[in-house]
């Protein structure tokens, strides 16, 4: 039960952070492209890869903290369902180039971010 509570608390924090990040992106860039979701998914991929790499390479991140951060915070922060919905909305609006750019930027951006975080954590760990 305690581990479930850790995931739930982390999820609440991650969801709140996602809302704030998306709201900021909407104010900063406008509604023409889903930059907020792109930002949370790419940065979330970077952070999750960093958390997992650090926790699996050493005991510096205890299992309960890893659960709180990875499944909880990052699970609440990133959003695959919004990515899919926003891609479909762009297609339905006839904005095929924007949909393709969003799809490519998300998939490639998330993979590059995860790879970069993994390399960074391994480099920092020596």
From Swiss-Prot:
Q: Extract one GO cellular component term from the record.
A: plasma membrane
**Residues annotated for Na(+) binding in this entry:** 75, 78
GO molecular-function terms, A-Z: fluoride channel activity; metal ion binding
Protein topology in the membrane? Multi-pass membrane protein
The annotated modulation of its activity is: Na(+) is not transported, but it plays an essential structural role and its presence is essential for fluoride channel function.
Q: Which reaction does it catalyse?
A: fluoride(in) = fluoride(out)
Positions of transmembrane segments = 4-24, 36-56, 67-85, 101-121
UniProt KW keywords: Cell inner membrane, Cell membrane, Ion channel, Ion transport, Membrane, Metal-binding, Sodium, Transmembrane, Transmembrane helix, Transport
Biological process (GO) annotations held by this record are:
cellular detoxification of fluoride
Pfam families cross-referenced by the UniProt entry: CRCB
Q: Where in the cell is it found?
A: Cell inner membrane
Q: Does the keyword Transferase apply?
A: no
Q: Which InterPro entries match?
A: FluC
- Cite the PANTHER family for this sequence: FLUORIDE EXPORT PROTEIN 1-RELATED
Q: Which family does it belong to?
A: Belongs to the fluoride channel Fluc/FEX (TC 1.A.43) family.
Protein function: Fluoride-specific ion channel. Important for reducing fluoride concentration in the cell, thus reducing its toxicity.
The entry's protein name is Fluoride-specific ion channel FluC
Q: Which organism is it from?
A: Anaeromyxobacter sp. (strain K)
